[in-house]
Amino acid sequence: MFDAFTLVVSQADTRGEMLSTAQIDALSQMVAESNKYLDAVNYIT
């Protein structure tokens, strides 16, 4: 997950731009999906 954040921020920095709302939303969605996965794993174990 850290790599995805690093990639998005690095690309925006290279272009000299701030992160767009769409990029922030996509990263937030990725975190939400990861949390669902972790919740399922914790439930099983």
UniProtKB/Swiss-Prot annotation:
- List localization entries: Cellular thylakoid membrane
Name the GO terms of the biological process aspect: photosynthesis
Q: Which InterPro entries match?
A: Globin-like_sf, Phycobilisome_asu/bsu_sf
Fetch the SUPFAM superfamilies from UniProt. Globin-like
What's the domain of life for this entry?
A: Bacteria
Entry PTM = Contains two covalently linked bilin chromophores.
Q: How does it sit in the membrane?
A: Peripheral membrane protein
Q: GO cellular component terms?
A: phycobilisome; plasma membrane-derived thylakoid membrane
Query: Predominant location of this chain?
Result: membrane
Task: Name the UniProt key words of this record, in alphabetical order.
Answer: Antenna complex, Bile pigment, Chromophore, Electron transport, Membrane, Photosynthesis, Phycobilisome, Thylakoid, Transport
Could you tell me what this protein does? Light-harvesting photosynthetic bile pigment-protein from the phycobiliprotein complex (phycobilisome, PBS). Phycocyanin is the major phycobiliprotein in the PBS rod.
Complex formation = Heterodimer of an alpha and a beta subunit. The hererodimer further assembles into trimers and the trimers into hexamers.
Q: Which family does it belong to?
A: Belongs to the phycobiliprotein family.
Q: What else is known?
A: Spirulina fusiformis, is used as a source of protein and vitamin supplement in drinks. In cell culture induces a urokinase-type plasminogen activator; may therefore be useful in dissolving blood clots.
Q: What is this protein called?
A: C-phycocyanin beta subunit
